[in-house]
From Swiss-Prot:
Expressed by the venom gland. This is Dermonecrotic toxin SpeSicTox-betaIF1. Its cofactor is Mg(2+). It is an enzyme of class 4 (lyase). Disulfide bonds join C43-C49, C45-C188. CDD domains: GDPD_like_SMaseD_PLD (cd08576). The active site is at H3, H39 (nucleophile).
Amino acid sequence: MGHMVDDLKMVDYYVGKGANGLELDVTFNSNGVAEYTFHGVPCDCFRSCTRYENINTYLDYVRQLTTPGDPKFQEKLIFLIMDLKLKNSPSSYAQFNAGINIADKLSQYYWKDDGKARAYFLISVPYVSQTAFIRGFQHRFEEKGLEKYYEKIGWDFSANEDLNSIRAAYQKLNITGHIWQSDGITNCLTRGDTRLKEAISKRDTPGWHINKVYTWSLDKVNSIKYALNLGVDGVMSNYAETLVTILSEDPFKQKFRLATYEDNPWETFKP
């Protein structure tokens, strides 16, 4: 998965490098209205932090790339991670509105052809204290009759919080599936593997409802290989081609491959 893919030029770049998933950073105003795909300073080392695009334009563009039959269709692109930047929407009211707004934007700009665009979306909320966003999203889906698109939506809490706290948050939301768990840190720093190993263990433990575990943002060959050997389901990187190359080599090509549209992102992989 390509990391911090926040303008159309970078979308084309990462798709061209073989990424089957892209992460986009979504910024909101104080009222919870999504405005741009934008990360800002600080960001990963050796990257530009200030690339951006209007969120409506971005969603319409990736709609074209993920719609079979469209002249711009890219078959390998199947997964989009929306990394929500909710710091400008600190109140529960604004976060609830942000959930409503993202549901609206997906229906207006991505699914506007009655769902012909086929990518899956992982909605990545930073903190368990921000579950008002999820409630707003769910409210709008049900209010507008968008429930059929739930099969395209998954959830993640991305701030490396305690896994038991995350589990409790999902229980309060009555979410028991379509759950990915992330673990990671900027490529400028190193991070231990204790929580990542714990997440993988919980994924394989009945009752935890974690379907996939991914790590970010890994750029070095040895770091990516180590994560794969631990058993992660996904790797987010600034260098998508590095992972593509690793997966073409022994011994990894015997165990792993890039996911395709035929793979269900909400099912736990059983080797």
